[in-house]
Amino acid sequence: MKIELDMHTHTLASGHAFSTIQEMAKAGAEKGLKLLGITEHTPGIPGTCDPIYFRNLHVVPRQMYGIDLMLGAEINILDGKGTLDADEALMKKLDIRIAGIHLLCYEHGAVEENTYGMVQAIRHPYIQIISHPGDGTAKLNFEPMVLAAKECGTLLEINNSSLKPARGKVDARSNNLEILRLCKQYEVPVILGSDAHISFDIANYQYIYELLQETEFPEDLIVNRSVEVFMNSLKKI
């Protein structure tokens, strides 16, 4: 399958990643991508950049080495109410807005509470992609999540990093298989994300491809196959 984009990556600015914007852009171009998303963590993650970083993104060129860039954030879902750790003023400054649950800053609840919070994030007018919903950090009911994504036009990510054996996320494989089967059933598009924290890992979808094959997931529901398909699928702000 041809891949033209990767929308979930991190640079040094996130505090625990290892490449610069230029290094990420160059690596993406060398891999033949046409579009790269750089999505730094918001303040709920220790060591990440301050909000002023996002307000100054206007100084960064949106094309380097022949590849287009979209600069944004991976915003934290904090609790079962769907509270986010970025305000509207910050989100307006971004090219792309992802939201996800992270162990370091999530207030865990029962499955029903976690699912409600996730659905609220999916319905948020500024959130365009949900990162690694299947990584098992919070227990979720996936069917309401998939149906909300279909209703709101928010893309659900299948995340390669969470599937790596070294990450130790024991439920990630079965969870992502369930999400893919539900998205196939309800004809909900997905986005593949590398979650690269170093340039060499950009557009690495090795473990995702195994799940796509196992579920016989339709290529026409994978938005990474072309920039045009992705942009047409992206929730408009």
Task: Label each residue range with its predicted role.
Residues 15-19, 48-51, 139-146, 166-182, ...:
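Histidine/acidic-residue-rich catalytic or RNA/ligand-binding cores of hydrolases
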Residues 22-36, 56-63:
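Alpha-helical scaffold segments that flank or form the walls of functional sites
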Residues 188-202:
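Short acidic/histidine-rich active-site segments
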Residues 5, 34-35, 46-47:
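Extended recognition/assembly regions associated with phosphoester-bond processing machinery
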Residues 1-31:
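N-terminal active-site segment of His-dependent metallophosphoesterases
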Residues 4-14, 38-41, 130-134, 194:
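Histidine-centered catalytic micro-motifs
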Residues 2, 42, 47-158, 162, ...:
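Extended substrate/RNA-proximal surfaces in nucleic-acid metabolism proteins
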